[in-house]
Amino acid sequence: MLSPKNTKYRKPHLGRLKGRASRCNQIAFGDYALQAKERVWLTSRQIEATRRTLTRYMKRGGKLWIRVFPDRAVTAKPAETRMGSGKGAPEYWAAPVRPDQILFELKGVPFQVAKEAIHMASYKLPIRVKMLCRNNNENNNSV
């Protein structure tokens, strides 16, 4: 699973996800893309499960780019612990995702294979997603 090698702060503030994605909202590398339509904190497990689904359906053909990286530590306190006594320990890594942000890109596979792979991968994510195509001959479908 993805995690940063080192970070400046071990327990960052959570912050808020406001607005839409102004960066990473257009296809940069591949021919097809998986675009988020809602805001969410994607965990490294969800990103890895989606990556495995995409690569397995493409039968390891073509190329896959992961455009999000889980670089924020999410903390949690143990169950049945009294309030206070500081912030909890880092539990897992997450990536903040805003609406219209590109999550994955594909290249080197036919349109039908990419469409079905993205459709299957959408079940691994907790948000609604949309498929984008670089050339506008194919339809852009919400999955």
From Swiss-Prot:
Coiled coil (UniProt feature): none
Entry's Gene Ontology cellular component terms: chloroplast; mitochondrial large ribosomal subunit
Ribosomal protein found in the keyword field: yes
Keyword terms: Chloroplast, Plastid, Ribonucleoprotein, Ribosomal protein
PROSITE patterns to which the protein is assigned, alphabetical: RIBOSOMAL_L16_1 (PS00586), RIBOSOMAL_L16_2 (PS00701)
Pfam families (UniProt xref): Ribosomal_L16
An example Gene Ontology biological process: mitochondrial translation
Localization per record: Plastid, Chloroplast
Taxonomic superkingdom: Eukaryota
GO molecular function: rRNA binding; structural constituent of ribosome
UniProt KW Ribosomal protein keyword: yes
Oligomeric and partner information: Part of the 50S ribosomal subunit.
Membership in a protein family: Belongs to the universal ribosomal protein uL16 family.
Name used for this protein in its record: Large ribosomal subunit protein uL16c
